[in-house]
């Protein structure tokens, strides 16, 4: 029958337009995420979220200095909240500080207990950094964790990292090309 990952590869090859969630067993659902922020005082939480939003907007506008400043303020306000570390990691990566980004991602995973939205995003970012550095085994491990936490992007990355899927995709593309453009002898 094959593993759920094998089934996901075949699903992606033969039915590329269907969502990966259709593969039985691939959605290894985590227990209810719950409210990750419920443990923080409401006023501080709202201020921290506002600072993060300002940081995200600054990063989107290309002002990484301000973004890092806002994320740092959010971290100072609630140092045990994973989300700001995850956001700061993204800004650090954009600034070229890969080591700093990885430190923040590790911290976010630790604070989140490896569960919830912040952990899922951290595993995706860590997987992307590993992939960009050519560390495909590390990328695969991080994407597997993110996929278990519900990330469809991580699932797609896992399929792309599978060498058998790459070979099958190449063979299928060649075969489809031959079917669309038959040789002159026919």
UniProtKB/Swiss-Prot annotation:
<dbReference type="GO" id="GO:0021954">
    <property type="term" value="P:central nervous system neuron development"/>
</dbReference>
<dbReference type="InterPro" id="IPR019734">
    <property type="entry name" value="TPR_rpt"/>
</dbReference>
<dbReference type="GO" id="GO:0008542">
    <property type="term" value="P:visual learning"/>
</dbReference>
<dbReference type="InterPro" id="IPR038906">
    <property type="entry name" value="TTC36"/>
</dbReference>
<keyword id="KW-0677">Repeat</keyword>
<dbReference type="GO" id="GO:1902915">
    <property type="term" value="P:negative regulation of protein polyubiquitination"/>
</dbReference>
<feature type="repeat" description="TPR 3">
    <location>
        <begin position="120"/>
        <end position="153"/>
    </location>
</feature>
<feature type="repeat" description="TPR 1">
    <location>
        <begin position="48"/>
        <end position="81"/>
    </location>
</feature>
<comment type="similarity">
    <text>Belongs to the TTC36 family.</text>
</comment>
<dbReference type="GO" id="GO:0032435">
    <property type="term" value="P:negative regulation of proteasomal ubiquitin-dependent protein catabolic process"/>
</dbReference>
<keyword id="KW-0802">TPR repeat</keyword>
<dbReference type="GO" id="GO:0007613">
    <property type="term" value="P:memory"/>
</dbReference>
<protein>
    <recommendedName>
        <fullName>Tetratricopeptide repeat protein 36</fullName>
    </recommendedName>
</protein>
<dbReference type="InterPro" id="IPR011990">
    <property type="entry name" value="TPR-like_helical_dom_sf"/>
</dbReference>
<dbReference type="Pfam" id="PF13181">
    <property type="entry name" value="TPR_8"/>
</dbReference>
<dbReference type="GO" id="GO:0006570">
    <property type="term" value="P:tyrosine metabolic process"/>
</dbReference>
<feature type="repeat" description="TPR 2">
    <location>
        <begin position="83"/>
        <end position="115"/>
    </location>
</feature>
